[in-house]
Amino acid sequence: MLDEFLKRPHQEIREVGGQFGDEFIPLADLTHLPTRCKFMGFMPQWDFLDFFAEQGKKYPQFHLLMEAEVTDLIVAGNTVAGVQANTPSGEIEVRATLTVGCDGRSSTVRERAGLQVESFGAPIDVLWFRISRQPSDPGQVLGRFNPGKILVMLNRDEYWQCAFVIRKGAFEQIKQRGIEVFRHDILSIAPFLKERAQEITDWEQIKLLTVLVDHLRKWYRPGLLCIGDAAHAMSPVGGVGINLAIQDAVATANILAHPLSENYVSLNHLQKVQWRREFPTKVTQWGQVQVQERILSAVLGSQGQVKPPWFLRLFKKFPVLRRIPARLIGIGVRPEHVKTHSIS
């Protein structure tokens, strides 16, 4: 499956660093990961999801409903028995022994289930936009840090996927300053973009990501389990949200495959999934909160010259240290491995 997956459009990044004013700090070296692919892959979400939809068609039990939006849960007594959903042809009901909510940070499933959320807040939001890329552009630098400004640029081959980090709730104020001032802010931190900043002509081209860091106190109730961002909204720091979501899914399959084959899933089974995945979730979120508070907030509040924190300079002096964040980004706190057999 991996070979087929890598045929899809993607970019491979083997080293990650940050530009703090005039100083470049290498932060992560993924070439030493104990994995077959010693890189971090970036793939457009459509290609990523389409690949797995195609793989699912190999299994006769797999059925994918496109353009189906969950609107409510079907509840029998205290047990979730399925979902109601809107489709182009009308409302439908889908009933199941177990409903798995994996519908993201604004999860309808977890909201309808009444599951309690513990939120840690976040001092930042992110503005996403695209700017065309030229072969003469500098290589991949994950983050650029200037006084009061942070720009993350992801190489998408033909264009840069840009994330401009702002203070929480500051988007309206930025819009009031005007699009020309925003373009100037971009050029002040990435001057090589020059005329291409003019590609940003309208606020409609810029999408606001409201950053959340939270997790459910309990990921489940009878007949229902939440995983991924539905169970724990991750900060974009490190870009590891998708990794944890996939690891949640693998752990869920490993733990629940046998009970599901017998058509009986108890609360104890669902609790085992949370026990397995709660620790890596909390550790990762703690790390993200530290980066947000100690680095990102400090840069956004700075007015003088930006200098990297002293501990980041250690990564420049001792290259072996770069393997630590590489492992956290590329593998995670508790990696999961598929232990279930393929179902024909």
Question: What are the language-model segments listed below?
Answer:
Residues 254-344:
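C-terminal helical "tail/cap" subdomain of flavin- and related membrane-associated enzymes
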Residues 56-71:
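A conserved beta-strand/loop element that lines the FAD pocket in flavoprotein oxidoreductases
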Residues 102, 228-229, 247:
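Active-site flanking residues adjacent to catalytic metal/cofactor-binding acidic residues
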Residues 1-57, 77:
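Active-site-adjacent segment of FAD-dependent monooxygenases/related oxidoreductases
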Residues 150, 211-216, 231-243, 279, ...:
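Glycine-rich phosphate/pyrophosphate-binding beta-alpha loops
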Residues 209-226, 282-283, 300:
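FAD-binding beta-loop-beta segment adjacent to the flavin cofactor pocket
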Residues 68-71, 78-93, 98-207, 211, ...:
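Conserved FAD-binding catalytic core of PHBH/FMO-like flavoproteins
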Residues 59-60, 77, 190, 318:
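Acidic-histidine catalytic/liganding microenvironments
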